[in-house]
Amino acid sequence: MKDNFTRLQSIVGKQLGIDPSKVKLESDFGRELGADSLDVVELVMAIEDEFEVNIEDQSASQIATVQDVLNYLERN
């Protein structure tokens, strides 16, 4: 089974239409990966589906990087 980072690379790549290999731990969804606010909402929904979690709005608003997502997944 893929590790969480590899799964996230795939999700982000698919949602944003970019090469998953360009998605790094420190990648900022908005500044570096070009995601707008709608993209971020769709990313959160895709992450929730893939990892079977519910990311509350307050938590989602604090997620800016791939590492932030991984940290959230580890805590929940």
From Swiss-Prot:
GO terms for molecular function: acyl binding; acyl carrier activity. It is found in: Plastid, Chloroplast. The keyword Lipid metabolism applies. Keywords: Chloroplast, Fatty acid biosynthesis, Fatty acid metabolism, Lipid biosynthesis, Lipid metabolism, Phosphopantetheine, Phosphoprotein, Plastid. 4'-phosphopantetheine is transferred from CoA to a specific serine of apo-ACP by AcpS. This modification is essential for activity because fatty acids are bound in thioester linkage to the sulfhydryl of the prosthetic group. GO terms for cellular component: chloroplast. It comes from the Eukaryota. Residues 2-76 form the Carrier domain. Disulfide bonds: none annotated. InterPro entries: ACP, ACP-like_sf, PP-bd_ACP, Ppantetheine_attach_site. The keyword Plastid applies. Pfam families: PP-binding (PF00550). The modification O-(pantetheine 4'-phosphoryl)serine is found at S37. Pathway: Lipid metabolism; fatty acid biosynthesis. Belongs to the acyl carrier protein (ACP) family. Carrier of the growing fatty acid chain in fatty acid biosynthesis. This is Acyl carrier protein.
